[in-house]
């Protein structure tokens, strides 16, 4: 279950301007990612694992950095049509921005990119029964790993856990 949570791209919903000069792609200060995050997009080379009821399809609600360097992920995923809340700990590895967790095999979760305020992208590698699965988020990053638009799922339109808690209120009609 823990692996599910990390298998997605996370994007912080914020009313701030994106500045490409603040994007980090190495030497991460992971303590700065603690806070409320919302899953926006997921991509995988095995779409069955991130489709509805897939074992890697999760909706992250919160990430907390621990003093020992590990990360706590608070997320929901679907079990028999119901959103189930789960909290998992991913152990820090020797590599900067990389974590490990056992779930449906051995997994590594690594920060791929972040600006610490508006978005963060995690790259998950799952090794199970001799098969390796890659899962990540945000279209721009996906292409770097050979995952095209056909491998991407928009969680904001399709995920019942997302719509249950985080759907934007209806906007008033525009007046011309």
Swiss-Prot record:
InterPro entries: Calycin (IPR012674), Lipocalin (IPR002345), Lipocalin_CS (IPR022272), Lipocln_cytosolic_FA-bd_dom (IPR000566), Maj_urinary (IPR002971). GO terms for cellular component: extracellular space. Gene3D superfamilies: 2.40.128.20. One of its GO terms (molecular function) is small molecule binding. It comes from the Eukaryota. PROSITE patterns: LIPOCALIN. It is found in: Secreted. Keywords: Disulfide bond, Glycoprotein, Secreted, Signal, Transport. The keyword Repressor does not apply. Its main location: secreted. Glycans are attached at residues 68, 129. The keyword rRNA processing does not apply. Residues 1-15 form the signal peptide. Disulfide bonds join 83-161. PANTHER family: EPIDIDYMAL-SPECIFIC LIPOCALIN-9, LIPOCALIN. Belongs to the calycin superfamily. Lipocalin family. This is Epididymal-specific lipocalin-9. It comes from Homo sapiens. The gene is LCN9.
């Amino acid at each position: 279950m823990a692996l599910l949570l990390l298998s997605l791209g996370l994007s912080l919903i914020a009313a701030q301007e994106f500045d490409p000069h603040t994007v980090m792609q190495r030497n991460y200060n992971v303590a700065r990612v603690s806070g409320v995050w919302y899953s926006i997009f997921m991509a995988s080379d095995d779409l069955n694992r991130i489709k509805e009821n897939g074992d890697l399809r999760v909706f992250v609600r919160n990430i907390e950095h621990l003093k020992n360097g590990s990360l706590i992920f608070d997320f929901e995923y679907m079990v028999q049509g119901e959103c189930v809340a789960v909290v998992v700990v991913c152990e820090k590895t020797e590599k900067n921005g990389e974590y490990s967790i056992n779930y449906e095999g051995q997994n590594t979760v690594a920060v791929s990119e972040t600006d610490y305020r508006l978005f963060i992208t995690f790259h998950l590698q799952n090794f199970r029964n001799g098969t390796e699965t890659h899962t990540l988020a945000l279209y721009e990053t996906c292409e770097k790993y050979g995952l095209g638009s056909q491998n991407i799922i928009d969680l904001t339109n399709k995920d019942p856990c997302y719509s249950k808690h985080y759907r934007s209120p209806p906007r008033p009609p525009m007046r011309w």
